[in-house]
């Protein structure tokens, strides 16, 4: 495929997205504390990138060094390019923090007190805090034959201490390790009376660098440097051998913290021989070491915007709106009976989704509730409603995806709580993550004097997660449409039972019909273009990687189909290549909210088919997951999806990045009229 149809590298594309995220921190139009937050988000994203993608690339090099990446590069060459770009990104990130953001914060009365700047009063306070709050929790480990180098946990904060002298047993002291327990605060507020700033903070590393000698009495501390090791965090569960997925997963979770090392981060001033020791102990090479000018974990600074009460330095708060069709209806069921309802988060509130489930839990007419859960958070009113429904005697069935990466433990806990109150809990289909977002409610109603069962459905592009519903852009559809409800019913039956492939009327479902329907729809546009008819494809998603879909889009471009792709993250397709993809544009929207909806638009000879989905156009979504795409039929709602989900992004000239044919992105510059998709929707919907 890559020989005939050129593809771009996935890992480089992911780093490119994080470069666009980091660019938000350099934008003076972004409030200052939000700029700090974007620096932290970049660090969090890079952590996952190393835990998953770089770990996988290293494994491939070890297991099959002669193999090629999908874009045709040798694994080692790809790895070298990714490392080089990651190093540049990290350097840019720390430079931006220290040369731009921190000085600007200081001007606003927000200051981080380094240990070498403390005056006598600050030093006395810091010593007292260390002795009272930190020292009792810390455990020094002196390295010698009886104390081997400890296996440090994934992404934990550690300090390597170079020592001189002999201890009480006469042993020559050379090196010690101090691991910082996760329970210790990484950022401590200094009293304002001592700080001299309205908001003064001290990092845990500053306490350690100044007072680590208290842990090694009568020895000379030659140096103290922080380091962090990132490990492979993929879980291995043998799907052919397991008899209980939850039990098997519970056994694997502790091992995540102790997987193979992937990356070493050290403070920039760490002596070379210390770095060599850390690399050797971690079985890492020189390329895997990242020397950073400051804290090795910037994610810990994510709490600063929450600790500082400065609304003028943050994004303006907003109140998400409630659609009149819901606000004016006696119940959610009455609102849905009156017609399909489209919710656009975060501009429209997620509360109606919660209310639908909460009302269903209490309504004596509701007999059954079925729900998929991928990510929902540790404190979820939605899960509380499901448990209340089960306690109230409803037939509650929940498909909990236990293998949702980094949410496995949370989902295991929810599954246990649901089972404890009598809900039916299933874990989907082994080998196929259930990523579809579906809720089905069965309610007994009286029509024409006769009792009958009516189904109500909610389908979404994003998770049933109230917190991220205020941070991610997503669409949700509430409907009582008979065909859609019947399709959802059958998908739930397939997930909970055993049966053959389904014949669905309205939904496209992976791993069965979703990919063929996408290809068929693209080919229909190709046929129309070749027949001289108008042809258009607009698709919005998080990632575009699947080779056969990319090949079909290239063919569409060559046939004259106008293709506009709005891909927030990684895109393997090359746009704008003469003779191949000159009719394709790719843009990425990066702003206050994480663009998350998946929208497929096909002109379809003027019929304008619009589908919403939980699926990106990636191999995993199309072939190894359970996903659904659902149509928007009501003309008014269809126009809304096109206008709010697609047109505003195509018109954005402030937060849009245009992809070039070499895979690099160029920020689209505003003309006389500034158009920002997210700000425009906030102004339209929110107060």
Curated annotation (Swiss-Prot):
It is an enzyme of class 2 (transferase). Its EC number is 2.7.4.1. Gene3D superfamilies: Endonuclease Chain A (3.30.870.10), Polyphosphate kinase middle domain (3.30.1840.10), Polyphosphate kinase N-terminal domain (1.20.58.310). GO terms for biological process: polyphosphate biosynthetic process. Mg(2+) binds at residues 375, 405. It catalyses: [phosphate](n) + ATP = [phosphate](n+1) + ADP. ATP binds at residues 45, 472, 568, 596. Keywords: ATP-binding, Kinase, Magnesium, Metal-binding, Nucleotide-binding, Phosphoprotein, Transferase. InterPro entries: PP_kinase, PP_kinase_C_1, PP_kinase_middle, PP_kinase_middle_dom_sf, PPK_C_dom2, PPK_N_dom, PPK_N_dom_sf. It holds the Pfam family PP_kinase_C. The active site is at 435 (phosphohistidine intermediate). One of its GO terms (cellular component) is polyphosphate kinase complex. HAMAP family: Polyphosphate_kinase (MF_00347). This is Polyphosphate kinase. It comes from Burkholderia vietnamiensis (strain G4 / LMG 22486) (Burkholderia cepacia (strain R1808)).
């Amino acid at each position: 495929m890559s020989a005939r149809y050129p593809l771009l590298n996935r890992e480089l594309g992911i780093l490119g997205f994080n470069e666009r995220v980091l660019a938000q921190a350099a934008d003076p139009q972004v409030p200052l504390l939000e700029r700090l937050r974007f620096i932290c988000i970049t660090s969090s994203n890079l952590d996952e990138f190393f835990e998953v993608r770089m770990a996988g690339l290293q494994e491939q090099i070890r297991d099959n060094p002669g193999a090629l990446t999908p874009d045709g590069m040798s694994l080692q060459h790809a790895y070298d390019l990714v490392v080089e770009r990651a190093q540049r990104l990290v350097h840019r990130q720390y430079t931006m923090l220290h040369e731009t953001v921190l000085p600007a914060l200081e001007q606003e009365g927000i200051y981080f007190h380094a240990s070498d700047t403390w005056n006598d009063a600050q030093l006395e306070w810091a010593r007292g805090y260390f002795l009272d709050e930190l020292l009792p929790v810390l455990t020094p480990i002196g390295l010698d034959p009886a104390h081997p180098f400890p296996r440090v946990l994934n992404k934990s904060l550690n300090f390597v201490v170079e020592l001189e002298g002999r201890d009480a047993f006469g042993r020559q002291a050379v090196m010690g390790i101090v691991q910082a327990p996760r329970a210790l605060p990484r950022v401590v507020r200094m009293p304002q009376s001592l700080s001299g700033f309205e908001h003064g903070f001290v990092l845990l590393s500053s306490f350690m660098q100044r007072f680590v000698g208290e842990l090694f009495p009568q020895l000379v501390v030659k140096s103290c440097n922080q380091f962090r090791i990132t490990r492979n965090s993929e879980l291995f569960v043998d799907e052919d051998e397991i008899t209980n997925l939850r039990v098997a997963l519970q056994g694997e979770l502790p091992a995540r913290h102790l997987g193979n090392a992937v990356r070493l981060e050290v403070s920039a001033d760490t002596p070379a021989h210390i770095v060599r020791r850390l690399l050797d102990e971690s079985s890492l090479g020189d390329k895997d070491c990242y020397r950073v000018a400051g804290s090795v974990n910037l994610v810990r600074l994510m709490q600063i915007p929450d600790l500082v009460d400065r609304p003028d330095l943050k994004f303006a708060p907003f109140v998400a709106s409630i659609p009149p069709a819901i606000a004016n209806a006696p119940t959610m069921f009455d609102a849905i009976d009156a017609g399909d309802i489209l919710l656009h988060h975060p501009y429209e509130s997620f509360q109606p989704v919660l209310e639908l489930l909460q009302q269903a839990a209490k309504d004596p007419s509701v007999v059954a509730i079925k729900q998929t859960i991928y990510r929902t958070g540790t404190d979820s009113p939605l899960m509380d409603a499901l448990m209340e429904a089960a306690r109230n005697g409803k037939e509650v069935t929940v498909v909990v995806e236990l293998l949702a990466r980094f949410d496995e433990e949370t989902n295991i806990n929810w599954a246990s709580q649901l089972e404890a109150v009598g809900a039916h809990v299933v874990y989907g289909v082994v080998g196929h993550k259930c990523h579809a977002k579906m809720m089905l409610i069965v309610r007994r109603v009286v029509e024409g004097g006769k009792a009958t069962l009516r189904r109500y459905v909610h389908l979404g592009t994003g998770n049933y997660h109230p917190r991220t519903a205020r941070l991610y852009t997503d669409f949700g559809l509430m409907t009582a449409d008979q065909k859609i409800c019947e399709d959802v019913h059958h998908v739930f039956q397939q997930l909970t039972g055993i049966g053959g492939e389904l014949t669905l009327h309205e939904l496209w479902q992976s791993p069965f019909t979703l990919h063929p329907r996408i290809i068929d729809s693209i080919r229909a546009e190709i046929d129309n273009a070749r027949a001289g008819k108008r042809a258009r494809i607009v698709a919005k998603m998080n990632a575009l990687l699947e080779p056969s879909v990319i090949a079909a889009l290239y063919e569409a471009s060559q046939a004259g189909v106008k293709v506009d792709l709005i891909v927030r993250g990684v895109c393997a397709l090359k746009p704008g290549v003469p003779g191949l993809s000159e009719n394709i544009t790719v843009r990425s929207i990066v702003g206050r909210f994480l663009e998350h909806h998946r929208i497929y638009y096909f002109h379809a000879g003027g019929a304008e088919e619009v589908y919403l989905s939980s699926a990106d156009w990636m191999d995993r979504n199309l072939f190894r997951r359970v996903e659904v795409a659902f149509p928007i039929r009501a003309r008014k709602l269809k126009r809304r999806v096109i206008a709010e989900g697609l047109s505003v992004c195509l018109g954005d000239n402030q937060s849009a990045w245009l992809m070039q044919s070499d895979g690099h992105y160029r920020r689209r510059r505003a003309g006389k009229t500034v158009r920002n998709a997210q700000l425009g929707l906030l102004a339209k919907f929110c107060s």
